[in-house]
Amino acid sequence: MRTLWIMAVLLVGVEGSLVELGKMILQETGKNPLTSYGAYGCNCGVGGRGKPKDATDRCCYVHKCCYKKMTDCDPKKDRYSYSWKDKTIVCGEKNSCLKELCECDKAVAICLRENLDTYNKKYKNNYLKPFCKKADAC
């Protein structure tokens, strides 16, 4: 639990409700979200942009597109609540904007789990994101 708290503190202010997003990724994939996805490919983590390197990176690309479609809330600041029931993420917000934010995060966590077999360690610490090729618009 302490590791999760440290991870959350490190991620605060990067994008979205990162405490919740980090928990979802950990629950769905069993991987540490910061060390496994914090700088993965061209789209996962801070400053992500560019043509996805693989299906795992595409999950992050789609997630960023999901955030861009939001107009009534701020994914960088707004927080939501969810629960983990029978190994399933349940978004519990009545506020439509916060529910949409939760659903975006839920979708990326599930996508990352479903694409664990495409996870490639050579893309894990990709700090050369400025050299990623331009991606298609969302």
UniProtKB/Swiss-Prot annotation:
It is found in: Secreted. SMART domains: PA2c. GO terms for molecular function: calcium ion binding; calcium-dependent phospholipase A2 activity; phospholipid binding; toxin activity. The record marks 121, 124 as: Important residue of the cationic membrane-docking site (MDoS). One of its GO terms (biological process) is defense response to bacterium. The keyword Signal applies. Keywords: Antibiotic, Antimicrobial, Cytolysis, Disulfide bond, Myotoxin, Secreted, Signal, Toxin. The record marks 128, 131 as: Hydrophobic membrane-disruption site (MDiS). InterPro entries: PLipase_A2, PLipase_A2_Asp_AS, PLipase_A2_dom, PLipase_A2_dom_sf, PLipase_A2_His_AS. GO terms for cellular component: extracellular region. Residues 121-134 are annotated as: Important for membrane-damaging activities in eukaryotes and bacteria. Disulfide bonds join 42-132, 44-60, 59-111, 65-138, 66-104, 73-97, 91-102. The record marks 129, 134 as: Cationic membrane-docking site (MDoS). Residues 1-16 form the signal peptide. Expressed by the venom gland. The keyword rRNA processing does not apply. Homodimer; non-covalently linked (probable alternative/compact dimer conformation in solution). Snake venom phospholipase A2 homolog that lacks enzymatic and anticoagulant activities. In mice, it induces conspicuous local myonecrosis, edema, and a systemic interleukin-6 response. In vitro, it is cytolytic upon myoblasts, and weakly bactericidal. A model of myotoxic mechanism has been proposed: an apo Lys49-PLA2 is activated by the entrance of a hydrophobic molecule (e.g. fatty acid) at the hydrophobic channel of the protein leading to a reorientation of a monomer. Belongs to the phospholipase A2 family. Group II subfamily. K49 sub-subfamily. This is Phospholipase A2 homolog 1. It comes from Bothrops atrox.
